[in-house]
Amino acid sequence: MEGEQQQQQQQSVAAVRPSLGKAPSPSFRLRNGSLNAVRLRRVFDLFDRNGDGEITVDELAQALDALGLEADRAGLAATVGAHVPDGAAGLRFEDFESLHRALGDALFGSLDVPEDGGGGGGGDEEMKEAFKVFDVDGDGFISASELQEVLKKLGMPEAGSLANVREMICNVDRDSDGRVDFGEFKCMMQGITVFGA
């Protein structure tokens, strides 16, 4: 029975990649080294919109949509369903952890990051792509209101107060102009990668 369930989970995970409406941005890769249990729990809590301790297919689809990863509902239902225990309405945290481990490269591509940065400056291209997600108006800077808008889309509680968002900006704003330029963003992201690993 357990071997059959594992095979079903593997097949459903393999079906996810073609069900995505577009290829996931490399900027949103889940990197095993930097996504520990505490961070995964925070992601789970964000995706669990109604706070009932389970993530339904609808809640997961809404979260993926907010990240720009439109997924086919049928494929998503099959993948999630393979990890939902009998009698449960959705993924509990331990099921979500199992799904996260199973998805690995199937959904987000290779998780290996070459030590030289990927050759040809690919790391900078990924960083620029991530920066563009936050630089909503395309002016080359991330303002507090732009950051707040993205945080709202992601359902993050930090988005509730513009003063808190401004404080977040101040923490990385080296030239004190009240906004984050690409260099400041890059330093911040490299710090997250180093300290989060």
From Swiss-Prot:
InterPro entries: EF-hand-dom_pair, EF_Hand_1_Ca_BS, EF_hand_dom, EF_hand_pair_protein_CML-like. Residues 1-28 are annotated as: Disordered. Residues 35-70, 122-157, 160-195 form the EF-hand domain. Gene3D superfamilies: EF-hand. Residues 1-11 have a biased composition (Low complexity). SMART domains: EFh (SM00054). Ca(2+) 3 binds at residues 173, 175, 177, 179, 184. Ca(2+) 1 binds at residues 48, 50, 52, 54, 59. GO terms for molecular function: calcium ion binding. The keyword Metal-binding applies. Ca(2+) 2 binds at residues 135, 137, 139, 146. It comes from the Eukaryota. Keywords: Calcium, Metal-binding, Repeat. Potential calcium sensor. This is Probable calcium-binding protein CML24. It comes from Oryza sativa subsp. japonica (Rice).
